[in-house]
């Protein structure tokens, strides 16, 4: 599994509970750094498991330099300072809770670009569905999703751009590991395939945020 992460790129570790996913991810991160494949990894884990993850990390690599978030780090008056620590520190890894991770925004420019792409895909999808004689429920569902994305784009374009915000791209992380990634589901995905069970026609905000950050990581690694 570790070799697959190192040489195979994006990897899903779908072992049973207790089969060693934590150690596999930790070893993958440290070996990646040793081999020069990355400089700083970020581990996105359930909020209540950050300390446990830190303990397991140091059990495997006692001399590792890791940064672990606490609740106080993401209080309004501390968040910018903590993000600056991530960006400027020479850490082997940063361990952060799911909800804290979601509070580090992607840059507005990247958000806007992704929204434009999604709106274009859905517009094409609506047209394709109509030409193929698709059912009205699917068309209406796609149109609702398109309106929602257009509203998000309009809100983003109207918002003030703050100079003092540290965006995800500025953290200096170049490898990401997500524990219990099933928390990020219900991401909208348009496909020309029909009647595929489990595909959502609506978009969950936190899943969209994760998708944007994964796309950024893929840019750094050439899609791997």
Enumerate the predicted regions with their spans.
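SF2 helicase/translocase NTPase motor core
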Residues: 19-214, 218
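Pre-Walker A (Motif I) flank of P-loop NTPase domains
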Residues: 7-13, 39, 92, 223-224
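Conserved pre-motif I regulatory segment
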Residues: 1-14, 184, 193, 197
């Amino acid at each position: 599994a570790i070799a697959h992460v190192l040489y195979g790129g994006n990897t899903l570790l779908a072992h049973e509970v207790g089969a060693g996913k934590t150690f596999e991810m930790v070893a993958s991160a440290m070996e990646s750094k040793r081999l020069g494949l990355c400089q700083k990894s970020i581990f996105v884990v359930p909020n209540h498991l950050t300390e446990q993850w830190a303990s397991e990390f140091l059990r495997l690599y006692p001399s590792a330099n890791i940064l672990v978030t606490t609740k106080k780090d993401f209080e309004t008056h501390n968040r910018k300072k903590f993000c600056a620590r991530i960006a400027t520190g020479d850490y082997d890894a940063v361990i952060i809770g799911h909800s804290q991770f979601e509070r580090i925004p992607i840059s507005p420019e990247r958000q806007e670009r992704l929204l434009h792409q999604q709106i274009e895909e859905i517009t094409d999808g609506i047209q394709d569905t109509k030409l193929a004689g698709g059912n009205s429920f699917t068309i209406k569902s796609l149109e609702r999703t398109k309106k929602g994305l257009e509203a998000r784009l309009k809100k983003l374009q109207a918002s003030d751009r703050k100079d003092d915000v540290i965006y995800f791209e500025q953290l200096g992380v170049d490898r990401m590991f997500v524990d219990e990634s099933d928390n990020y589901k219900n991401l909208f995905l348009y496909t020309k395939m029909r009647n595929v069970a489990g595909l959502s026609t609506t978009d969950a905000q936190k899943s969209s945020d994760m998708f944007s950050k994964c796309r950024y990581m893929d840019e750094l690694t050439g899609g791997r």
